[in-house]
């Protein structure tokens, strides 16, 4: 359906301060800091979807929102000419209780890289990039038919699609980040990016890594695929000893390249189980609506269908693999000869574009990145 949906004429309103220390309840007067404008005829979904089906794919757009790991000092600096971007960061300051913009602009990088900081930072920067895109190419927002976000990026995608208000979405991200930071500090764990090949057996490698950990006296060791990126490329999360074992034995498992990721824990595994309840309590206390644009879940790769579906899967996402490769197939799979929509990665980094190229080269040919570093340029007259 069209983003009558999500015209990024985001409506800004003021709201009062709240105690930043409590995660039990949402801001008492948190109004729609970034409510996406809704058309009065939005209830006529069947008619809207029929219109979307008639629109040529080349006139449609897809927005992709990045996740943790793409943060860099200076992000957001190219967007501050836009008044609404400054309002985003001012609102974020109130929700978070600290100056997120200052941290993003000046760092230091090691503070920005902490899970508790980088998840809100990427969330806000990505929605700021949507503002830039709307400023430069408003038709892209109006013609958006689908959105997806990688891990924490899924929250930004849902805010863009009108399923959550900005303030409450950020409040949920804050709770998620703090709970995941605490869980990651309980067990020495991490994430390993693995580029394999056709004969690579990721599951078998993980099982042998678990057995190695047991031989070291580690009880209930964790080692499993946590991100499906593109064919033959996975991220494996778990105990550090398991990941080190895989690196030492990469030739045995036909791994072409391995790299430890700069994250604080074994995300998207059962090691994050302690983070689920705090997040679910917050998700249960905020207003979640049916998305006005199709948003695809990391857990299933399929579209969300209703608010309870969103709550359930956002909680599961913390301890489940990110099925990004499957999501890309779900969005872009089509008959031979059919056109592809334009794709925009909104936020820091271009990792999702690189992954799209490996999943579907034809779809990637219509890919663009909305940078959050460079100074904004007005559209050509």
Curated annotation (Swiss-Prot):
Pathway: Lipid metabolism; fatty acid biosynthesis. SMART domains: PKS_AT. One of its GO terms (molecular function) is [acyl-carrier-protein] S-malonyltransferase activity. Its EC number is 2.3.1.39. It catalyses: holo-[ACP] + malonyl-CoA = malonyl-[ACP] + CoA. Disruption phenotype: Conditional deletion in retinal ganglion cells leads to disruption of retinal ganglion cell axons. The modification N6-succinyllysine is found at residue 312. GO terms for cellular component: mitochondrion. It is found in: Mitochondrion. GO terms for biological process: fatty acid biosynthetic process; mitochondrial small ribosomal subunit assembly. The active site is at 151, 268. Keywords: Fatty acid biosynthesis, Fatty acid metabolism, Lipid biosynthesis, Lipid metabolism, Mitochondrion, Transferase, Transit peptide. It holds the Pfam family Acyl_transf_1. Expressed in retinal ganglion cells. Signal peptide: none annotated. Gene3D superfamilies: Malonyl-CoA ACP transacylase, ACP-binding, Malonyl-Coenzyme A Acyl Carrier Protein, domain 2. Its main location: mitochondrion. Catalyzes the transfer of a malonyl moiety from malonyl-CoA to the free thiol group of the phosphopantetheine arm of the mitochondrial ACP protein (NDUFAB1). This suggests the existence of the biosynthesis of fatty acids in mitochondria. Belongs to the type II malonyltransferase family. This is Malonyl-CoA-acyl carrier protein transacylase, mitochondrial. It comes from Mus musculus.
